[in-house]
Amino acid sequence: MQAEITWLDDPEVFRVNQLPAHSDHPFYADEEECRRGNSSLCHSLNGMWQFCYSKNAGERPADFYREDFDTAGFDEIRVPGHIELAGYDKIQYINVMYPWEGQDYRRPAGTPSAENQRADLFSGAVYNPVGSYRRVFDLPENMKGK
């Protein structure tokens, strides 16, 4: 399976691989766990993850999700966190122009102008940072089949 990024240029696409709406309320194996407030059915993925920063989608490691992918070129980053505060890219403040202002031509997706008929204004942009995160973990025995 090859990941496609051209959805970035289609104004009718507003989500890709998004889970359907669901409750994020905590749940417990039994009433006693609920009283203690510590669920045996929760496994935190917070911590250090493998991370690869790419300045645009064309440079991203497209197959990094595969089990046999070599992550030797990946760094480590703390999750949750912000890539900018971890030293990747530039911090974006609200009182400052966006980094692509004056660098890349950006019109709303799907609205090419007479001067610029490119269909890949976002997916083919020179500057459109992408972060690829990866973490391998073993599912605890008590969570299997749940």
Where are these regions (language model features)?
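Extended carbohydrate-recognition surfaces in non-catalytic/accessory domains of CAZymes
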Residues: M1-G145
